[in-house]
Swiss-Prot record:
Naturally occurring in which organism (per UniProt): Pisum sativum (Garden pea)
GO molecular function, one term: proton-transporting ATP synthase activity, rotational mechanism
Xref: Gene3D superfamilies: 6.10.140.480, F0F1 ATP synthase delta/epsilon subunit, N-terminal
Known function: Produces ATP from ADP in the presence of a proton gradient across the membrane.
One Pfam family of this chain: ATP-synt_DE
UniProt-recorded name of the protein: ATP synthase epsilon chain, chloroplastic
Record GO cellular component, one term: chloroplast thylakoid membrane
Subunit structure as annotated in this protein's UniProt entry: F-type ATPases have 2 components, CF(1) - the catalytic core - and CF(0) - the membrane proton channel. CF(1) has five subunits: alpha(3), beta(3), gamma(1), delta(1), epsilon(1). CF(0) has three main subunits: a, b and c.
Amino acid sequence: MTFNLCVLTPNRIVWDSEVKEIILSTNSGQIGVLQNHAPIATALDIGILRIRLKDRWLTMALMGGFARIGNNEITILVTDAESASDINPQEAQQTLQIAEANLNKAEGKRETIEANLSLRRAKTRVEAIVETIKRIS
C-alpha cells in the first residue's frame, strides 16, 4: 500500500514517486504519514524527511516550507532539499564548523538570527548523513 510523494523546490522536482511511509519535521513536531492519512496542511521546519520505500528508508534534508496531505498524495514545497546521498560529508562538516564560528562572532540581533538559521541548516545536513550511515551499518 503506497501513496505519491512529491517534493518541490523553486528550481526543481526533488522527488516524485510512490512511497510506503514518511516522517516529516513540522513546526509543531514530527508527523508520520501512511496511506489514507487524514487531510492536513502544515508548515515544515528545517529538518529531516524520512522516506520509506518497500524495505528501506531514505533520508532527505528539508530547509523549511509547507506540506499538503490528502487523497493519498503528499505535496511538499520547500526552500531547498537535498537527498542525504547527494551531500558531501566533508563539505557538510566544514559548513557546520563555519556556521558555529559565525554564530560565536555574530553581533546584533539580525546577525545572530541569520547565524542561527545557517547553523540549523548545517546541522540538518549533517544529521541526514549520520542517519543514512546508521541505516547502512
